[in-house]
Swiss-Prot record:
Native source organism of the sequence: Trypanosoma brucei brucei (strain 927/4 GUTat10.1)
Protein name as it appears in the record: Alpha-tubulin N-acetyltransferase
Region annotated Disordered, chain positions: 314-334
Claim: Repeat is one of the keywords in the record: no
Catalytic activity: L-lysyl-[alpha-tubulin] + acetyl-CoA = N(6)-acetyl-L-lysyl-[alpha-tubulin] + CoA + H(+)
One cellular-component annotation, GO: microtubule
PANTHER family: ALPHA-TUBULIN N-ACETYLTRANSFERASE 1 (PTHR12327:SF0)
Keywords: Acyltransferase, Transferase
Function: Specifically acetylates 'Lys-40' in alpha-tubulin on the lumenal side of microtubules. Promotes microtubule destabilization and accelerates microtubule dynamics; this activity may be independent of acetylation activity. Acetylates alpha-tubulin with a slow enzymatic rate, due to a catalytic site that is not optimized for acetyl transfer. Enters the microtubule through each end and diffuses quickly throughout the lumen of microtubules.
Domain N-acetyltransferase: from-to ranges: 1-186
Recorded superkingdom: Eukaryota
Enzyme class: transferase
Length: 334
């Protein structure tokens, strides 16, 4: 199958209310054990696997990042599934990763354990209707996170544009592991270390520090997933746990969106802004059709743009997910 052809598996009808449900391996196994007399749990599993395949093809990845077998391999991972009209619309997979990154304040490595967005996909027939924002914000609400608290595994330029438009997230330091950690993350947790405030949801420490204490926990992902959590401090509709919950009114969802606006400093453009301009130019030059998906015309990730600019210094490195990320050699040669 070529990248220009999306997975043609038909998404089954689900007995789930419109809105977001949250799943992990344990909940899926419980659903299959207790509520599968009519094949309902099997249809949920088929939906997750199908959307995972479509995500892989849409992003031109070498491997499927989201599937029920992968959730069984990483039992701390959580999957947010958005449904509308009784069918799956989008998926968002998260998990905690231990990362070694260079913060913006100094050149030394720092160890952090943030919640990471590992896969984020809205079915192509439902894009540009506000579903991605619904899915992302419901994840933030349940994980008690702000947008700048999450790290993102190899985000596309489209995802970076989404974060800038809705949350004003722009500045980040390119990392060799191709995770994007915005400067807001470090600013927030520097304040937390000084006791000024913060969510306490993501921990970090410098590699040369002797203390083993880290801020917060692993974002609650090691907690019992069925544990009762306090309600969010703001109104939230349609977020459900497993198979129960109120319906979500998705009528006129695009009209309900109000993008987050943040003033940006004028003057020299950031590296992200230059990447974003390249992405917009590629969209203008793209032939009509399924823009942004498949073949060599797809938008490059921030790491790919940076690696391409380095030409001879470019190399690939396998990762835990099997995706060959572009990273930069320290030497000037190949």
């Amino acid at each position: 199958m070529t990248h220009n052809v999306m997975c043609d598996d038909v998404l089954p009808q689900l007995n789930l209310p419109d809105g977001v449900t949250r799943w992990n391996a344990n909940l899926l196994e419980e659903e299959r054990r207790l509520r599968n007399s009519d094949g309902h749990a099997d249809r949920i599993i088929l939906t997750i696997n199908t959307l995972g395949k479509r995500s892989k093809e849409a992003q031109s990845l070498n491997t499927i990042l989201t599937s029920v077998p992968r959730l069984r391999e990483n039992r701390d991972a959580r999957l947010y599934l958005l449904c509308h009209g009784g069918r799956g619309v989008g998926i968002l997979k998260i998990g905690v990763k231990r990362l070694f990154v260079v913060p913006p304040s100094h050149a030394g490595l720092m160890e952090i354990e943030p919640v990471c967005v590992l896969d984020f996909f809205v079915d192509t027939s439902n894009q540009r209707q506000g579903y991605g924002k619904i899915l992302f914000e419901h994840m933030l609400a349940f994980e008690r996170l702000s947008p700048g608290d999450v790290a993102i595994d190899r985000p596309s330029v489209k995802f970076l544009a989404f974060l800038r438009k809705h949350y004003g997230l722009v500045e980040y330091t390119p990392q060799s592991n191709n995770f994007v950690v915005f400067h807001k993350y470090f600013e927030r947790h520097q304040q937390q270390r000084r006791g000024v405030g913060g969510s306490g949801r993501s921990g970090y420490q410098h590699c040369n520090e002797t203390t083993t204490q880290q801020l917060g926990t692993q974002s609650g992902l090691l907690e019992d997933i069925n544990q009762t959590h306090p309600a969010p401090s703001y109104a939230l509709r349609g977020v459900v746990m497993g198979h129960t919950g109120p319906p979500l009114d998705l009528t006129n969802v695009t009209q309900q969106q109000k993008p987050y606006h943040q003033p940006f400093a004028t003057g020299r453009k950031t590296s992200y802004e230059l990447q974003y301009e390249r992405y917009l130019q590629s969209q203008n030059c793209r032939p009509t059709g399924n823009a942004g998906y498949g073949g060599g015309n797809g938008p490059a990730s921030s790491a790919e743009v940076r690696a391409t600019n380095c030409q001879a210094r470019r190399r690939t490195s396998p990762t835990r997910s099997g995706v060959p990320y572009n990273i930069i050699n320290g030497s000037t040669g190949s």
